[in-house]
Amino acid sequence: GGSWEGSAGDGNTASLQLRLLCRRALADSMDSDDILAVTRAGLDHYHKHYGYTFPWGSYDQIFVPEYNLGAMENPGCITFNENYLSRDTPSFALRQKRANTILHEMCHMWFGDLVTPAWWENLWLKESFAENQGTTTAAEATIYTGEWASFAIGRKAWALAQDQYPTTHPIVADIPDIPAAKNNFDG
């Protein structure tokens, strides 16, 4: 782990322990230096741009096996699929993809956890904003300056393909219950 200290335009200061956790068999694959560099850069960037101090008392990142999501934000703790770790030296592309995911989920600490849409029909708002912010922050605040090119050939191309399928749906949909919310969640 490590630590981070910073402040935002609201005049408050945060002092956080940054913890990285995974199962023991992958401890040597953690790539802590890169993950912590991205984490610190993201915290600095979001504090500067949002003007609101990190609202939670800790910041943990946990890499878990057999996780059916890429990652998930929880107040002060993000869980990631352990596939973001590599037993070999991680490629630049893997590290860049991981950085985007770290920054996307970190954005949710402010826009998703601190401020949350009232109901699932507005899921698109928090997800599209976090997608934009993860890409923007990676490109502006980390060594992954080519992140917008990766977005264009990866995420944008995927979205355009999804829109051609008969299963496509409006961005804002009627979501009467939780199962409908799950069916409306893309990517």
Which residue stretches match the model-derived regions?
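Hydrophobic helix-coil surface modules that form long, contiguous segments used
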Residues: 1-103, 132, 156-158, 165-169
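Second-shell loop/turn segments in exported
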Residues: 24-34, 119-120, 181-186
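Short alpha-helical functional segments enriched in proximate histidine and acidic residues
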Residues: 45, 49, 109, 113, ...
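Surface-exposed patches in mature extracellular/periplasmic domains of secreted proteins
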Residues: 53-61, 117-121, 145-150
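Active-site proximal loops enriched in glycine and acidic residues that flank catalytic Cys/His/Asp
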Residues: 63-65, 82, 113, 127, ...
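Acidic/His/Gly-enriched intrinsically disordered linker/tail segments
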Residues: 71, 127-187
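Active-site His/Glu-centered metal-binding helix of metallohydrolases
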Residues: 102, 106-111, 129, 133
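Catalytic Zn2+-binding segment of zinc metalloproteases
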Residues: 106-122, 140-141
